[in-house]
């Protein structure tokens, strides 16, 4: 775990350095930095299909979702450096106790060097995980009273994903970009070995049964596409798609789509709709989908 902690600390330090650099170089802050932060709380309705791995057995109800997003982008000469941190956590009570609706830790740091008007050579580190335990409700063995118990299926950095990539970025405008990274490397971490594993002893592709906590993968190609645009006054659409093609199993490419629709009602109120679709055979050999609709407070600066 020491190595895992070092990797995470290194990645998060990139974001912290944004603020430090901005404070120490006031002229660059004014001229070259563009920063945006939003935070808030929404009351929401959430639902899942039966395949959603992080909270299997939870159908959905009314709950509360908290979020914090901050992004800093530096542009000077041919250098483009983007740091993006997204934190989300939501709970609901559907009559069977408190359950999660959403739980996400996302950090991305990408630095690029322009080689033409629309193309850059870039390097990137991406970290993704969650905050708390997730369960497959009612799927465990029966207790002394004959009631089915819940299976622990996820936790903080169980799984956790750290991806390093170097490649080409196509950035034709300010609202869309796409990266191409042959040879991207991904580490899957399972820090909690008490989570449930399959008949082969694997949890998220990691051999937990035999005491392993880390799996390394190399992609023949990783593609990431981002779209972020105000499609109407006070209405924003944000999309992120990621494809990771492990060279050892091209028939089982991992795909993830994140979509977020935000409509501001006034300065502090907004409506948000989140949609996530995941296909990753190391999690579950079916398409996972989740959606979250909420109305609540939004503060941006």
List PLM regions with ranges.
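Transmembrane beta-strands of outer-membrane beta-barrel pores
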Residues: 41-47, 76-78, 87-93, 125-133, ...
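Surface-exposed strand-loop-strand hairpins of Gram-negative outer-membrane beta-barrel proteins
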Residues: 45-65, 95-98
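Residue-level signature of outer-membrane beta-barrel architecture
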Residues: 70-74, 113, 125, 170, ...
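Solvent-exposed loop/turn segments connecting transmembrane beta-strands
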Residues: 59, 75-77, 94-98, 217, ...
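Membrane-embedded beta-strand positions of outer-membrane beta-barrel proteins
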Residues: 37-39, 83, 123, 166, ...
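Repeated loop/turn-to-beta-strand initiation elements of outer-membrane beta-barrel proteins
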Residues: 78-81, 118-121, 175-178, 234-237, ...
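Outer-membrane pore/translocation modules
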Residues: 101-218
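Outer-membrane beta-barrel "beta-signal"
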Residues: 289-301
């Amino acid at each position: 775990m020491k190595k895992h902690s070092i990797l995470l600390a290194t990645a998060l330090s990139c974001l912290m350095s944004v603020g430090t650099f901005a404070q120490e170089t006031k002229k660059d802050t004014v001229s070259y930095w563009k920063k945006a932060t939003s935070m808030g709380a929404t009351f929401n309705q959430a639902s899942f299909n039966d395949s959603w791995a992080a909270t299997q057995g939870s159908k959905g109800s009314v709950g509360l979702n908290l979020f914090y997003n901050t992004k800093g982008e530096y542009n000077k000469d041919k250098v483009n450096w983007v740091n993006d941190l997204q934190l989300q956590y939501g709970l609901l009570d559907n009559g069977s106790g408190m359950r999660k609706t959403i739980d996400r830790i996302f950090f991305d740091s990408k630095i690029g060097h322009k080689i033409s008007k629309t193309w850059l050579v870039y390097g990137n580190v991406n970290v993704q995980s969650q905050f708390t335990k997730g369960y497959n409700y009612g799927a465990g063995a029966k207790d002394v009273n004959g009631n089915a118990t819940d299976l622990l299926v996820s936790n903080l950095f169980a799984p956790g994903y750290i991806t390093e990539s170097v490649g080409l970025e196509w950035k034709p405008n300010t609202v869309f970009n796409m990266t191409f990274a042959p040879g991207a490397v991904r580490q899957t971490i399972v820090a909690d070995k008490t989570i449930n594993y399959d008949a082969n002893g694997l949890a998220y592709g990691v051999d937990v049964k035999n005491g392993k906590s880390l799996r390394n993968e190399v992609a023949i190609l990783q593609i990431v596409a981002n779209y972020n645009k105000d499609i109407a006054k006070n209405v924003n659409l944000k999309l992120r798609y990621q494809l990771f093609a492990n060279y050892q199993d091209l028939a089982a490419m991992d795909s993830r789509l994140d979509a977020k629709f935000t409509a501001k009602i006034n300065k502090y109120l907004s409506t948000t709709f989140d949609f996530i679709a995941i296909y990753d055979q190391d999690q579950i050999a079916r398409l996972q989908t989740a959606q979250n609709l909420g109305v609540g407070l939004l503060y941006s600066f």
